[in-house]
Amino acid sequence: MKKTLLAAGAVVALSTTFAAGAAENDKPQYLSDWWHQSVNVVGSYHTRFGPQIRNDTYLEYEAFAKKDWFDFYGYIDAPVFFGGNSTAKGIWNKGSPLFMEIEPRFSIDKLTNTDLSFGPFKEWYFANNYIYDMGRNDSQEQSTWYMGLGTDIDTGLPMSLSLNVYAKYQWQNYGASNENEWDGYRFKVKYFVPLTDLWGGSLSYIGFTNFDWGSDLGDDNFYDLNGKHARTSNSIASSHILALNYAHWHYSIVARYFHNGGQWADDAKLNFGDGPFSVRSTGWGGYFVVGYNF
């Protein structure tokens, strides 16, 4: 789910890098030589994308591809497939049966046959980030499209760095007031740093941060029990990942920091019918991922 994108993206980026080297030496067998895919089991702890803290364990399919002008990352989740806490609703307990996120980028340089590089900017993309939550009713559905400009940066260091800036169009958003309109912006930074060989595998550090701002949600008429705005116009999600990858198996541990997670105001007082509670949308969460590349 969007809760796990930063963990999952780290694993996929690492999988691609390591698999290329492993293919030269050990010739591991995959279904495709360019569409890199895996099945993962993901455990999440204290994720903060909704008004209540969530823990769950779920099944995930993810894929990564980079071929000519096409750069792709995406995943499909079956939420709460293996269970979760009382606030986690998913495939088996009347929650959403499917959550999907994709990040296709299309190289402007290659599609126009033009070298647009200058300075540290190696290549330019039409960048997209689409999020879909199937849900079972309007209060569980989300459909969000971020679109904009992306680039890869030459840092001169043994690391990769990409930047994307988007405008957001919001369709469904769990019944929030900003549905069916242009609503804010996102800046995304992603980096990958190979560290060392470890236990026969490859250990890397990966970081992802989303900065969201300019949304109308912070100015709507949804107030908490104390008369304060329950939503915000901005949020930050920043993940820090250690990933260990082999030819087929991969493992990662993720620490993720949320600020106004899901654009919920931290410490807002709410009551959805089961008694009052305080929103905890700012703080740390974590993930553990085990996956198999095929």
UniProtKB/Swiss-Prot annotation:
GO terms for molecular function: nucleoside transmembrane transporter activity; porin activity. It comes from the Bacteria. SUPFAM superfamilies: Tsx-like channel (SSF111364). It is a multi-pass membrane protein. One of its GO terms (biological process) is monoatomic ion transport. InterPro entries: Channel_Tsx, Channel_Tsx-like, Channel_Tsx-like_sf. Transmembrane segments: none annotated. Pfam families: Channel_Tsx (PF03502). Keywords: Cell outer membrane, Ion transport, Membrane, Porin, Signal, Transmembrane, Transmembrane beta strand, Transport. Disulfide bonds: none annotated. Residues 1-22 form the signal peptide. Gene3D superfamilies: Nucleoside-specific channel-forming protein, Tsx-like. Functions as a substrate-specific channel for nucleosides and deoxynucleosides. Also functions in albicidin uptake and as receptor for colicin K. Also is a receptor for several Tsx-specific bacteriophages. Belongs to the nucleoside-specific channel-forming outer membrane porin (Tsx) (TC 1.B.10) family. This is Nucleoside-specific channel-forming protein Tsx. It comes from Klebsiella pneumoniae. The lineage of its organism: Bacteria, Pseudomonadati, Pseudomonadota, Gammaproteobacteria, Enterobacterales. The gene is tsx.
